[in-house]
Amino acid sequence: VRENRNRSMKTNHILLILVSLVVIAAVAYMLTSAESPEVYQEKIEAERERQYKFIRFNVESPLTEEQKRDFKELNFYPIDPNYKVKARLIPVENRKVREVPMTDGSVERYIEHSYAEFELGGKTNRLLLLQSVSESDMRNFFLAFADETSGRETYGGGRYINARQDGKNSITIDFNLAYNPYCAYNPDYACPLPPKENILNISIQAGEKNYKD
């Protein structure tokens, strides 16, 4: 009996050690996988550099050759991690195709997919996530929005974010990655306008600012 009891105690002790190791490993993983402020800063800066090179050098750039010759830089707000938010996904009931107005008066077709609900600026905000009718990856969304900086510090026709679902019922929206549509650089382009649901009553002082010739 004593031998069985000792064996049982040893087994429980081993299980306790294994559980402790699993917990320690999980905590270590969370700590090492969490993005440090320095890594986050570098990631945003790298994306901005990529964006600059595309606008400055790529043949698909919206800039004319004359604009490219005079082009010096893109204008951004300082990087602020507070503008990276985790939003709750709320599926749109009875999803339908919406004809989104373009800056030239035409329309482009998108699916009304979900609402992204998040806290920012001391209030609860909600943005409509659209999905192109030709999108093959169902986790990718198109987000066009305007806010209280629009028409002043940022482009009056709104800004865009390429959003990707990263949780079962959630999505990360990083306003530091907000960028201008092509028509902000060249009026010969036609660009989707933000839906009325996506006109925010707060200032989003993050991402790209007005383009200056």
Please give the residue ranges for each predicted region.
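Positively charged n-region of N-terminal signal peptides that target proteins for export
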Residues: M9-I14
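Mid-length scaffold segments of soluble, non-membrane domains
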Residues: E93-G157
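Acidic, glycine-rich flexible loop segments
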Residues: L143-Y179
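Short, Lys/Arg-enriched N-terminal segments with co-localized hydrophobic residues
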Residues: V1-S8
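Hydrophobic membrane-insertion alpha-helices, especially the h-region
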Residues: L15-M30
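Ser/Thr/Pro/Gly-rich low-complexity linker/stalk segments immediately outside membranes or between
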Residues: S33-A46
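Extended, aromatic/histidine-rich regions of cofactor-dependent oxidoreductases associated
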Residues: E38, Y179-D213
